[in-house]
From Swiss-Prot:
Its main location: cytoplasm. Keywords: Cytoplasm, Isomerase, Metal-binding, Zinc. Transmembrane segments: none annotated. Its EC number is 5.3.1.8. This is Probable mannose-6-phosphate isomerase. The active site is at R314. One of its GO terms (molecular function) is mannose-6-phosphate isomerase activity. It catalyses: D-mannose 6-phosphate = D-fructose 6-phosphate. It is an enzyme of class 5 (isomerase). It comes from Dictyostelium discoideum. The lineage of its organism: Eukaryota, Amoebozoa, Evosea, Eumycetozoa, Dictyostelia. Its cofactor is Zn(2+).
Amino acid sequence: MENNNNNNNNNNNNNNNNNNIVLLKCVSQNYEWGKYGSNSTVAKLLKGYAKECSDIIKETIPYAELWMGDHVSAPSKVEYKNKELKLREYIDTVQKEINEKSSTSSSSSSSIRGEIVEKRFGNDFPFLFKVLSIRTALSIQAHPDSQLAQVLFKKYPNIYKDPYHKPEIAIATTPFEALCSFRPLSEIQSFIDTIPEFKNSLPNNLIKLDDCKEYLKSIVTSLLKADGLLISNNLKELNNRLNEKREEERDDLDRLVLKLYSQYPGDVGVFFAYILNYIVLKPGEALFLGAGEPHAYISGDCVECMAPSDNVVRAGLTPKLKDVDTLGDMLTYRTGRPDLVVPQQRPDLSLTNYRCYQPPVDEFQVEYYHLDDCCKNINVYSSKGPSIVLVYSGNLSIENKSNQSTLNNLHTGSILFVPANTDYQFIQSDSSIPVSIYVASVSNRIFNKNNL
């Protein structure tokens, strides 16, 4: 499914200026865990940006993810001079035209990607931007660091399809359930001691080691490598026991285990409810996941941004390949509460109207803008790198101050590419309809580093 909205005053084909803001056609992914049909935010965004999608959305199909970027598996596209180009092709084509034009004039050419971004990332688009709409739990998984990603890509290119690491941020847009990072070891041990089905799934000779990380690793790897029939039988007993409880006797963790079992009966990943932290993010709260941090998204909607990778090492809650050995060796085994990203505020705007989520990586940051009765337009600080704008809800125009053009009739689901060093403004079209916008860009961290 692609974004085909071209109802704007600024025609992508007419101007070779490197500050053109252009519409993107983006691709949805129909993974089985996604919400079905019009219940999915991804489907609503598809309907919003292209009227023709309204007849294409099928209520029996899961719409799990919307991808925005230049990943080889689902690159965004741009209509340019009556051709449909992948985002990378579009950038390269326009950059070549700009360079050729500057070579015949006294003006110097500037970079669409941004000079610092090109030095740091070359011609690779620095990030992958997504929307997720989750019906059933995603796999117990973690992402490799840069070194391991290169090794996995070289050894297993059919499984791990790129050589990049995948740090990521998930910003909740609805209540958002997740398992993330290891619980304190004392909590895990307490569950082993008090939940017989969990204890019986571990070896009788499991030794409590003084080294907490090594002990935790032995618990995890022993569980992942346990006999499948043993795990299945113990989970069945656990499910039966929890179902025998009255509803008022069950706690949130009991309900989580029952939910996971109903979705993945007999899967060892169900036991990870006792190993990983269970959290429920409120809308606007954000979770950062670095390399080697185990996690599983369970339900809800989020905006997600990451390095441009699709590398996932799985070990549970999935019918897909489980790479138990790789996962067991790559996890950090860091215990404690998950890393929530505290949004930064702009001095001239309230947290209601602006939030910047900046995790500790160079590839990306995400800004949130909200237009309402009290704040009908917002000037966007230009980034020294490329940006992708997602209109999550509402109607607006974008005034491009760098080339004195305006894009009108933007609405829910409109997605745009913004070149580096472009000044622009969001303008609310209808004061009765609030507007929510997410902007992914290269982290200001790398520009601040270069200014030191």
